[in-house]
Structure formats: C-alpha cells, structure tokens
Swiss-Prot record:
This is Enolase. Mg(2+) binds at D242, E285, D312. GO terms for molecular function: magnesium ion binding; phosphopyruvate hydratase activity. The lineage of its organism: Bacteria, Pseudomonadati, Pseudomonadota, Betaproteobacteria, Burkholderiales. SMART domains: Enolase_C, Enolase_N. (2R)-2-phosphoglycerate binds at Q163, K337, R366, S367, K388.
Length: 427
C-alpha cells in the first residue's frame, strides 16, 4: 500500500504573475509528488470554482491562501492514510468532502492540486513515467499540437476579437517534426511582422498579438508565414480558430468591435463558413456563446461534417453537460481543461465519454500556466490525439512541448503520430 503520510499546499505564481496553488504529497516510502494548477482568463460560467481570497490588499484579491488552507487542514485530514494508487477513491473522497456541485466550498484549485500531486507520487512509487501510469501499455500516441501563433480577445490587448489563431501540423511525420514545423512558422511570422513594423510582443499564451485591420488579415499573415517557412498550407499545416465567442456575445448578437460588425448567430455562422471555404481551417473552438445552444445547433448543422467544432466554455469538461450536447447533436469535440472540473478522475471520464460518442477530446492548457507538464502526460496516456498548449515561446508553454518530446523518445519505435487522423470526427 502506497499510503499518503503528508500533504503540503502552498501559494506560488502562475505565468501571469497571479497566485495559484501547488501541492506536495509524501508517501510512506518517502516518494513525493508535486503538482501546480493553472488558471484561465476567459472562463465558462459553469466551470468548477477557483477559490480566491478576495482580499484587495493582497494580490488584487487573487490570493489563494484559503484554498491552500483547505489543503493543509480539511483535505489533508480526509486523505492521509489513503492509498495513493486508488485515484478514483481519493478523488471521490474530496468531491464528497466539498459537498457542492462546483467545488465551491474547498475550491477546484485545491482539489485538483491534490489529485495531480497524488498521481505523480503514485507513478513515482510504481516506477512508471506519468503517461504510462495514466494509460498503461496502451498510451503510445503523441498528440497533434494546435499552436496558437496569433493571440487576440482576452489573451491580448489588440484589435482582434477572436482569441486564438492556430497552426496545426497535420502533415508532419512525427511529433518532433510537428514541433519543428511550428517553430519555423513562428519565426517566419515574427520576421514578417517585424519587417512591416508590426509589434512582435506576445500574449499570454506566447503567440504574437498584432493589431491588424481584420481577422482575415491575421489569417493571411499566418498563411504567408507558412509559405515563407517552406510548408504547404492545408497539406502540411492546417489552421484552427478559438473564437471564444462568449466574450463578444452581447444582447443576442455577436459583436466584432474590431471590425465594427454586429451579427446574428446565423450571419456569424455564415462568416465562419465563408472563412472555412477560403482557408484551410479544420477546427473552430467556441464558435458560439456557451448559452446559445440554438446557435451551436445551427453551426453544427452547417459545418459539423467539415470542421472540428470544439466545445470549451460550452462543455467545461463536465460529463453532464457533454452528455446533453451529445444527445442534442451539438458540436463534435470537447476541450479538456483539468481545472474546469477539479479532479483527474472526472477529467478522464469526460475524455472517455467523448470518445465513445465519436467526439474528439483536445487536451488544453490555460492562459495562466506554470512549469507543470501534467497535461502532456494526460494527452499521451489517454491517446487523446490533440493538444493545445500555446505558441513556440514562453517557458510555461514550451515545458509541455519538451515533455512530449521526452515521451516520444521514451516510447521509441512504438510512438505514433496521428496527423490528420486525429480528426476522426470529420466525415
């Protein structure tokens, strides 16, 4: 038995300079696991609650000492002595201890930190790399990265309403080559922007944050960079968008303030469909407001067989909401963010539910990240097939890419890279 003998929570900083929660878990054998949780900027209204202190005199109210105290008192008292290898039982213990539907009492940032740290300790105790601990012998597929090279919306201070413009190296023969494709396009884009006197400052997720005249102008810059780097758009590198449409939904319309446009759901769907016709876009995330299920239904009927339609704010990694979406034929993919739900067990349940329904599951970072690379191991351990972890800059993003490179090396000849096959939800 790998008994838990000590748990220590602490307040650390994330990539935006805001406090977040880190946890150490010590086992009877002396083995220790450590994990830190991320934090989002654009969040779904039904996400599990991230507990903040609210003391404006300290970190502008964003301190997490209450969550840390919950780890060091209530949670610790409840899980000390439990077997670290019994992840589902441990997570259920914390869920029951919290007693709310959204972890609003203890904080999802507290429960997740413990859940992740326990898994790391148990993997170390068993002598397995974390991805192997999660997936057994079946975890051997590297994910296709969706690389956010231009940032807008809540992730940048510019004129773009859409939040992310991504490159997806579907034609790469391996993950290592996919990273190379992405890095070379990133540097080509930086050169193009610099030569035109456009800022090469980066946003929260490491992508550039230029002020350009339109969203199509941003897409065209990326296509130019792909060509400049020597790749073929659509064949070797496809495009993806994260609209984060809940952020610009006002009074029943979609308001693109940067282009001075106010659109109904139907007209907004028409605009997205036009872009799909013109450009090699194969994935659109949060194309409609999280509460606009009629708009989502319209978008799914319009593009659901041609484009991966990812629900992030829509589903918030919650199996109850995902099941409703599956039943109603809404979207065809779910974004998986571990801190939206607050335990690893519930995260894995959402991934499994999506796969059974023929939906893809895209493992994702948050805009506020740390050096913790657990999501890389989750992506491989669950054979998810896709990952979003930012651009090719900022060490908080690169940490995940580097961990995936190590995993690919560890797997050796049995490592696989699905490429376009990761988009099995497209007909």
């Amino acid at each position: 038995m790998s008994a838990i003998v000590d748990i220590v929570g602490r307040e650390i900083l994330d990539s935006r300079g805001n406090p977040t929660v880190e946890c150490d878990v010590l086992l009877e054998s002396g083995t220790m696991g450590r994990a830190a949780v991320p934090s989002g900027a654009s969040t779904g209204s039904r996400e599990a609650i991230e507990l903040r202190d609210g003391d404006k005199k300290r970190y502008l109210g964003k301190g997490v000492l209450k969550a840390v105290e919950n780890i060091n008192t209530e949670i610790s008292e409840s899980v000390l002595g439990l077997d670290a290898s019994e992840q589902a039982f441990l997570d259920r213990t914390m869920i029951d201890l919290d007693g709310t539907d959204n972890k609003g009492r203890l904080g999802a940032n507290a429960t997740l930190a413990v859940s992740m740290a326990v898994a790391r300790a148990a993997a170390e105790e068993s002598g397995l790399p974390l991805y192997r601990y999660f997936g057994g012998m079946g975890g051997m597929q590297l994910p296709v990265p969706m690389m956010n090279v231009i940032n807008g919306g809540a992730h940048a201070n510019n004129s773009l309403d859409l939040q992310e413009f991504m490159i997806i190296p579907v034609g790469a023969p391996s993950f290592r080559e996919a990273v190379r494709y992405g890095a070379e396009v990133f540097h080509a884009l930086k050169k193009i922007l610099g030569d035109r006197g456009i800022s090469t400052a980066v946003g929260d997720e490491g992508g550039f944050a230029p002020s350009v005249e339109s969203h199509e102008a941003a897409i065209q810059l990326i296509l130019e960079a792909i060509d400049k780097a020597g790749f073929v758009a659509g064949e070797q590198i496809a495009l993806g968008l994260d609209c984060a449409a809940s952020e610009f939904y006002k009074d029943g319309n979609y308001v693109l303030s940067g282009e001075n446009l106010t659109l109904s759901a139907g007209n907004w769907a028409d605009m997205l469909a036009t872009w799909v016709d013109k450009y090699p876009i194969i994935s659109i995330e949060d194309g409609m407001h999280e509460g606009d299920w009629d708009g989502w239904k319209l978008l799914t009927e319009r593009l659901g067989k041609r484009v991966q339609l990812v629900g992030d704010d829509l589903f918030v990694t919650n199996t109850k909401i995902l099941q409703e979406g599956i039943d109603k034929g809404i979207a065809n993919s779910i974004l998986i963010k571990i801190n939206q739900i607050g335990t690893l067990t519930e995260t894995f349940a959402a991934i499994e539910m999506a796969k059974r329904a023929g939906y893809t599951a895209v493992i994702s970072h948050r805009s506020g990240e740390t050096e913790d690379s657990t999501i890389a191991d989750i992506a491989v351990g669950t054979n998810a097939g896709q990952i979003k972890t930012g651009s090719l800059s900022r060490s908080d993003r690169i940490a995940k890419y580097n961990q995936l490179l190590r995993i690919e090396e560890d797997l050796g000849d049995i490592a696989s890279y699905p490429g376009r096959g990761a988009f099995y939800n497209l007909k």
